[in-house]
Amino acid sequence: GTSRAAMMFLSNWLNEYGELGIMSVSSEYLSGRSVYINKESRINHALNHGGAAVVRLYLEEEHYVLMTGVKNGNILLFDPYYWDKPYEQKDILMDWNHPRSYNRVVPFKYFNQENEEIYSLGPVEEREAVLIFNEKTKTVPEEVIEYFI
């Protein structure tokens, strides 16, 4: 598995490459209470505005996935673990039609749990995520106007 220090290293490494102009990329390291899923979270904001998120969660053990989008109360993610049968949880779906974007569709409700159940982010104090943005396509809150009725 990947060490926790590696998450911060990944974020710093991506930012260095972006600052040097090697890649058009930036990142942000999140931990603890900043790592959760809902409409107002920084993770969801990144996913809704062209970013992605590497998060540590649980799938039989600590595990890392790449979140790539949000759709209808679900997180679209790429899970590198090969899984060839349906999950016991019928609302967690495998998707083989988007191999360059995601291969799992997981409802929000699984992530914010503080236990070590499937796709849980686990105890708040142990949570980590790295938000990743393509600087050419990234939008910032000031550039996005949202209307609430």
Tell me the role of every PLM-derived stretch.
Residues 1-119, 123:
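Conserved active-site-adjacent core of cysteine acyl-enzyme catalytic domains
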Residues 60, 74, 120-149:
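Mixed-charge, low-complexity intrinsically disordered regions
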